[in-house]
């Protein structure tokens, strides 16, 4: 009897038969393989400076995604979503069908068309946090946690968070551990998992 109990305890301690160790999911961050040639990414893939754009390393697969950008230094910048076909050396983004962005002047652009605009008294300033929600149809903007009721749509296909900077702008990205609580139903970007 004692031998069988010992055997059982050893089996549990060693992880049991067929134990598969869990791999830690990679962190969502700015992707140094998908950025403009004059872009600088620092702070473990969380800060962008220089000139040009950069995609995040994870596409928006889930139904309702949320992410944030904090404006550390003003200048020319834009944030939103883009496909892998977006030209990250040609800014501002939003000039073609490969990106939908809010620019630093509060205008939301897609395919070189202004789709919406933030109120003039609600333009993001240095230190502000801009939240983005995306549900595969509509992109919405939040300023310091407040819904700006400024939706834009049109982009199709697999999209990624995108950010571009120029003229001394510095932006920090938050893909988790947000400054503000995501709106109901929206959550951080999840990596797609394949099980087989």
UniProtKB/Swiss-Prot annotation:
Annotated B30.2/SPRY domain residues: 1-184
CDD domains in alphabetical order: SPRYD7
Domain of life: Eukaryota
Name this polypeptide is given: SPRY domain-containing protein 7
Annotated organism of origin: Gallus gallus (Chicken)
Taxonomic placement: Eukaryota, Metazoa, Chordata, Craniata, Vertebrata
Gene from which this protein is expressed: SPRYD7
């Amino acid at each position: 009897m004692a031998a069988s109990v010992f055997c059982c305890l050893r089996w549990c301690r060693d992880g049991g038969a067929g134990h598969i160790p869990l791999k830690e999911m990679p962190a969502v961050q700015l992707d140094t393989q998908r950025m403009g040639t004059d872009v600088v990414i620092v702070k473990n893939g969380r800060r962008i400076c220089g000139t040009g754009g950069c995609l995040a390393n994870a596409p928006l697969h889930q139904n309702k995604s949320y992410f944030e950008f904090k404006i550390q230094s003003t200048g020319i910048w834009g944030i939103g979503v883009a496909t892998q076909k977006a030209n990250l050396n040609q800014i501002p983004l939003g000039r073609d069908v490969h990106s939908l962005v809010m620019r630093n002047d509060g205008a939301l652009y897609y395919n070189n068309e202004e789709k919406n605009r933030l109120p003039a008294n609600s333009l993001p300033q240095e230190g502000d946090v801009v939240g983005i929600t995306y549900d595969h149809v509509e992109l919405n903007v939040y300023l310091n946690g407040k819904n700006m009721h400024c939706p834009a749509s049109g982009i199709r296909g697999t999209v990624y968070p995108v950010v571009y900077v120029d003229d001394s702008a510095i932006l920090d990205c938050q893909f988790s551990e947000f400054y503000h609580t995501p709106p109901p139903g929206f959550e951080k970007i999840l990596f797609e998992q394949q099980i087989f």
